[in-house]
Curated annotation (Swiss-Prot):
NCBIfam families in the cross-refs: acid_shock_Asr (NF033636)
Protein's cellular compartments: Periplasm
Signal peptide: 1-21
Originating species: Yersinia pseudotuberculosis serotype O:1b (strain IP 31758)
Keywords: Periplasm, Signal
Disordered: annotated segments: 40-121
InterPro entries: Acid_shock
Protein name: Acid shock protein
Propeptide residues, chain positions: 22-63
Length: 121
């Protein structure tokens, strides 16, 4: 930005000095007009040129291209864990078939008995 401003100031000072020189030296009228034309052409050329900014190579990589080197951290086992963090390991126990079932688990096969009519006496 500062370079562009400096170029603009230099161009305006250059034009004003050429115009001042053309006004003071009236004897060299053809030479003064040719110099103002060349200076005007140069200023137009400098105004339309884009200055290339040299970018420094950044060492920025894409997130996926970064190599994550994880160091193997040695963690000691915590002495006490929270209740929710405890792992419940249930061992598979061999169950034998129960000899006697509970009363509610028994299957009741009741046959409906008809009431026996008592003889009339």
């Amino acid at each position: 930005m500062k370079k562009v401003l400096a170029l603009m100031v230099a161009a305006t000072l250059g034009l004003s000095s050429v115009a001042f020189a053309a006004d003071t030296t009236a004897t060299a009228t053809p030479a003064a007009t040719s110099t103002t034309a060349t200076v005007a052409a140069q200023t137009k050329a400098t105004q339309h040129q884009k200055h290339k900014v040299t970018k420094k190579t950044t060492e920025q990589k894409a997130q996926a291209a970064k190599k994550h080197e994880k160091k193997a951290s040695v963690q000691k086992a915590p002495v006490q864990k929270a209740q929710a963090a405890k792992k419940h390991v249930k061992k598979a126990s061999v169950q034998k078939a129960p000899v006697q079932k509970a009363q509610a688990a028994k299957k009741h096969h009741k046959t409906a008995k008809k009431p026996v009519a008592a003889p009339a006496a």
